[in-house]
């Protein structure tokens, strides 16, 4: 039974709490009851995987307490019961390939887990789950005569998504990263985009960016085909160059993107790629954290001594930004645990 404080109005993220609570575990029988409890406090709002940290705190604390009483290794217990590919989640679907087992194994092998503790220190282990979704998304990519690209997206950057989308566009076009500029456009400029929430931005807008870049590449190939007087299907795009293929391979000198865009005013006008979609499904992620905390036995003050994050990142588009998200999430979790009621 979960009870979440909703504040003065209903709306606590009970659905997500129930989805996340037992997601890391292979359990044949699960029954969850959730209550959205009204209280004399301000209305709640979504914040950092709404509902998931509360669920993890409840379930993972119980698992650690159980392991402590039975003298069991907390990671071994989690490994024995971990969700893996083919496991049916407590809320219905079967998992595809997921990385929870790998996270647990990496955590157990990490030097932190076997490091000695001193008097007044304790060690906690926790696994957690979150997911993202698609939502309505539209992206436009316009090429300039100087060979640069202007990417317009409708999702505000709250986690480094602009840098990631610049990377994806640059990779598809075959041009340097600094040749792509991303602008956050409004609804009047671009069309409707769902808001930046639910960890959806790089997932959905990133996919749309790739598709918009490929749309632009298709048009670049058409311009090259026009120059060479061959079929569009006989042109491929490789490393930022239009190249003849098939029977025409080697017959013409490859044309770089900047040369094609420089002449686009004379070969058909602006080259703009566009894509809009509502991606379905969800990308899921699991993590395991190890924390050493120390309590001052005279004052009762607690502070974190050591913190290790192991997470299944999937494809880390911008690794340093992904690491920053790990650090930020850990810092916010520490804040919740030690500084907030």
Annotate each PLM feature.
Residues 51-58, 69, 92-95:
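Short, contiguous, pocket-lining structural segments
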Residues 67-76, 223-228:
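Short, charged, surface-exposed loops that flank catalytic or proteolytic processing sites
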């Amino acid at each position: 039974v979960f009870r979440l404080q909703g504040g003065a109005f209903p709306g606590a993220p009970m659905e997500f709490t129930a989805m996340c609570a037992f997601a890391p575990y292979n359990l044949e029988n699960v029954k969850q009851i959730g209550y959205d409890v009204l209280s004399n406090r301000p209305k709640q709002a979504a914040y950092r995987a709404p509902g998931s940290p509360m669920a993890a705190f409840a379930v993972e604390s119980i698992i650690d307490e159980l392991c402590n009483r039975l003298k069991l290794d907390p990671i071994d217990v989690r490994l024995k019961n971990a969700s893996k590919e083919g496991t049916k989640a407590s809320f219905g679907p079967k998992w595809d390939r997921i990385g929870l087992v790998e996270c647990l194994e990496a955590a157990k092998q990490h030097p932190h887990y076997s490091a000695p503790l001193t008097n007044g220190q304790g060690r906690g282990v926790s696994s957690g789950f979150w997911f993202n979704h698609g939502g309505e998304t539209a992206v436009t990519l316009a090429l300039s005569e100087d060979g640069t690209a202007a990417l317009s997206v409708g999702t505000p950057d709250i986690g480094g998504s602009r840098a990631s989308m610049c990377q994806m566009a640059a990779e598809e076009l075959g041009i340097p990263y600094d040749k792509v500029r991303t602008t956050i456009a409004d609804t009047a400029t671009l069309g409707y985009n769902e808001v930046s929430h639910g960890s959806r931005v790089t997932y959905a807008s990133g996919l749309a960016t790739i598709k918009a870049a490929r749309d632009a590449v298709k048009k670049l190939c058409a311009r090259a085909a026009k120059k060479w007087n061959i079929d569009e299907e006989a042109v491929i795009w490789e490393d930022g160059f239009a190249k003849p293929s098939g029977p025409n391979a080697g017959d013409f000198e490859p044309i770089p993107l900047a040369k094609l865009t420089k002449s686009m005013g004379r070969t058909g006008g602006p080259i703009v790629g566009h894509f809009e979609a509502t991606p379905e499904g969800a990308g899921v992620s699991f993590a395991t954290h190890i924390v050493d905390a120390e309590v001052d036995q005279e004052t009762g003050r607690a502070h974190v001594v050591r913190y290790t994050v192991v997470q299944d990142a999937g494809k880390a588009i911008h690794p340093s930004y992904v690491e920053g998200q790990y650090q930020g999430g850990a810092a916010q979790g520490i804040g919740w645990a030690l500084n907030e009621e």
